[in-house]
Amino acid sequence: MNIIEANVATPDARVAITIARFNNFINDSLLEGAIDALKRIGQVKDENITIVWVPGAYELPLAAGALAKTGKYDAVIALGTVIRGGTAHFEYVAGGASNGLAHVAQDSEIPVAFGVLTTESIEQAIERAGTKAGNKGAEAALTALEMINVLKAIKA
C-alpha cells in the first residue's frame, strides 16, 4: 500500500496571496496570519511571497486565475471576508468566490487555498481572524504549503 502525506516546510515555495480590501479590518489579520505561517512554519522567504489586493471577495477568483496562469507560483492563497447581511448578496458573493477559486485550482493544477471567511456576523469573522477560533489565514497558508508537497509527491 502506498500512502502519500506531506509536511508543510517548503523553503523554496513561491506563493501568491490575493486578498480582498472589502472588510480589510478583518482581512488584515488573515494576511498577518498567512504571512506568519508561511515564513515561520513553512520557511518561505520574503522574496518568494507576492501579495495582490483586489476590491472584494468576488474578484478573488479572477486574480487567483491570473496569478496561477503566470507559472511563477507554486500556490495561491485567497483571503477575504463575506458577512451575511439582510439580502441574498451574501450567497452570490460567497458562492461565486468559492466556486471560482475551486475552478482555478482544477484548471491550473496548482493549490488554491481557500481563506475566505463566510460568517453570520462581524463577531464570528473576528473570532476566525486570530482570536477564539484561530486564524483562518494561517490555516489557508499551511494548506497551500502541504498541498505543494502532496502534489510534488504524487508527480514524483
UniProtKB/Swiss-Prot annotation:
GO terms for biological process: riboflavin biosynthetic process. (2S)-2-hydroxy-3-oxobutyl phosphate binds at residues 86-87, 128. 5-amino-6-(D-ribitylamino)uracil binds at residues 22, 57-59, 81-83, 114. One of its GO terms (molecular function) is 6,7-dimethyl-8-ribityllumazine synthase activity. It catalyses: (2S)-2-hydroxy-3-oxobutyl phosphate + 5-amino-6-(D-ribitylamino)uracil = 6,7-dimethyl-8-(1-D-ribityl)lumazine + phosphate + 2 H2O + H(+). CDD domains: Lumazine_synthase-I. The active site is at 89 (proton donor). InterPro entries: LS, LS/RS, LS/RS_sf. Its EC number is 2.5.1.78. GO terms for cellular component: cytosol; riboflavin synthase complex. Catalyzes the formation of 6,7-dimethyl-8-ribityllumazine by condensation of 5-amino-6-(D-ribitylamino)uracil with 3,4-dihydroxy-2-butanone 4-phosphate. This is the penultimate step in the biosynthesis of riboflavin. Belongs to the DMRL synthase family. Forms an icosahedral capsid composed of 60 subunits, arranged as a dodecamer of pentamers. This is 6,7-dimethyl-8-ribityllumazine synthase. It comes from Escherichia coli O45:K1 (strain S88 / ExPEC). The lineage of its organism: Bacteria, Pseudomonadati, Pseudomonadota, Gammaproteobacteria, Enterobacterales.
